[in-house]
Amino acid sequence: MSAHIEHQTRLLIENRWDEGKAAAMSPQELLLYRSHLLGADKRVTNFGGGNTSAKVRMADPLTGGEVEVLWVKGSGGDLGTMGLDGFATLYLEKLLSLRSGYRGPEDEDRMVGLYPHCTFNLNARAPSIDTPLHGLIDRPHVDHMHPDAVIAIAAASDSRELTRQVWGGEVGWLPWLRPGFELALRLGEFVRQHPDAKGVLLEAHGLFTWGNTSQQCYRNTLEVINRAIAWLAGKNAGNPGLGRQRHASLPAPRRREVAAALMPRIRGLISTPARKVGHFDDSEAVLQFVGSEHCERLAAIGTSCPDHFLRTKIRPLLLPYDAERDSLEALTARLPAAIDKYRGEYGAYYERCRRPGSPAQRDAHPVVYLIPSVGMITFAADKATARIAAEFYVNAINVMREAEGVSSYRGLPEQEAFDIEYWALEEAKLRRLPPPRPLAGRVA
């Protein structure tokens, strides 16, 4: 085996389905098992991202007759750690009947308000906006994932052609469309027209796959992702996709020293209106990105996948720093002006894109701070959320690097990004979050 092929093999995601363990499981338990396997690997989907579903025949508590019930991951929660109570359950027939009343894309918010009327057995778990995407795909088992390798192809400027090159006719392609009922209708139509397809790539978004059994669905999901991983590894061998390295990384102790000096200073500048906690990441992927000649250009384009920028804001703040010439004091002194500039640009973005009825502008401070030669700092309401934001931006880095290696990376149009960030449904989700704990945002 050549060294390159051996490297490719190490990159692939292992099929961890245990037939013996799965043999005694109910359909619902198999769905949960599949969800845990998929959610355990961040190459498959990020924390809290993606969703899974199964269509299960069950006794109707109202009539005693048998009905088909859509079990689908509900709003919030994480695939890798959720329990059965994390699934929303809906009468499939009622959900499908909503097609007759759908009036077009302007009707999306109203449709979401109708999903609770389809609830089976008084389940309190709120359905997510992806619910109809699962329901209208006429397959028993469906996965929706955000794998870095697949999103790299989805975010490439020639995404449709690359999809054909990677998967042939096994995986289809649909142009960007905001998640909702319109996209669900298009997915359903695609499946009807391509009965032999294993899945479909959604431009600038992610992947849908399906199967006739839970195990087959899991296997198809891994096969589609692994095909992308292997194809990108072959195409990008020896090609970092980020250009030459412009800034060499500092030694690890010095990186930590710089981060330790910056973090309390940044925290003091951004902890109004709410206190925040920071996280530092100097992993290899981050150091390669912040040191590359294309970092400034790519960071300015912004992230593409909605799951990414909802956690990280559309763009990071890249701090100007030349470790060979600049002192730490000089870098620290630049922070107030750099953060003020970012806040002004974010406010201008809000004013350019706001619509009548848009929610009020949110906190304009950066979430992600990139420092050449040093790494990345993220700030959020608590340590866990700051760490997760860093994980999401590493996902975005992986996408940009791989897309640039085979094509050119393309972010979402600014208005599309704004319409998701300030979507009334996202605002409602934020309002459902529990209030901060008394010591949230504080450090000891």
Task: For each feature predicted by the language model, list its residue ranges.
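Glycine-rich flexible loops
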Residues: M1-A444
